[in-house]
A protein has these predicted regions:
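C-terminal structured interaction module
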Residues: 153-180
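Soluble ligand-binding/transfer domains with enclosed cavities or grooves
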Residues: 2-147, 151-157, 168
Length: 180
């Protein structure tokens, strides 16, 4: 069995994650999952432009989410089909962190596991290849928890002076797993 990107970064802390979170991050190959999601719109015109640049939802929605994963030992591609928007990102390892490529942005996350919760802490960001200064770096809440066969997620990103750029929360039902 190949160790997932998240297992590699977390090491022994991986065992502290809720079983549903562990199961989700051990999925390999091409799989699809279904669940429910709610998205919030960006706070300002500038925040909407930035949301467009990083391909995150720009309209408030509530409804089904269809999630497609293509995971190998070196890279994971996540495609989130929201009710009115599709968002794709690619995750790889970078110096002991997870690097997520999302449109014109590269996000560098440290991972933390505590009491079943996975927290992704943004440590660095590059926009169009240019490093973002710490004072301008977004405040990001990115958490996953598990409840039975559901992976719950909560993502919220705000940029100083622009306000909320992206926000969505919901769950994926692990019993809906389909091999693609």
């Amino acid at each position: 069995m190949t160790t997932s990107l998240y297992e590699t970064v977390l090491g022994t802390q991986y065992a502290q994650l809720a079983p549903a979170v562990q199961s989700f991050h051990r999925m390999a190959g091409r799989v699809r999952l279904h669940g429910e999601v709610e998205t919030e719109p960006p706070d300002s015109r500038a925040a909407r432009w930035l949301a467009w640049c990083i391909r995150t939802p720009r309209m408030p929605t509530q409804g089904p989410i269809h999630f497609a994963l293509h995971a190998t030992a070196r890279e994971e591609t996540w495609t989130r089909h929201f009710p009115r928007h599709t968002m794709r990102s690619t995750l790889t390892l970078h110096r002991g962190r997870i690097m997520e490529r999302l449109g014109a942005v590269h996000l560098f996350f440290a991972l933390e596991a505590q009491d079943g919760l996975l927290r992704m802490r943004l440590e660095a960001l590059r926009f169009l290849g240019i490093p973002c200064p710490a004072w301008l770096r977004p405040t990001v809440l990115a958490e996953e928890t598990g409840n039975g066969e559901r992976l719950h997620f909560h993502v919220r990103a705000s940029v100083p002076l622009l306000g909320l750029v992206a926000a969505y929360r919901g769950y994926l039902d692990l019993t809906t797993l389909e091999l693609a």
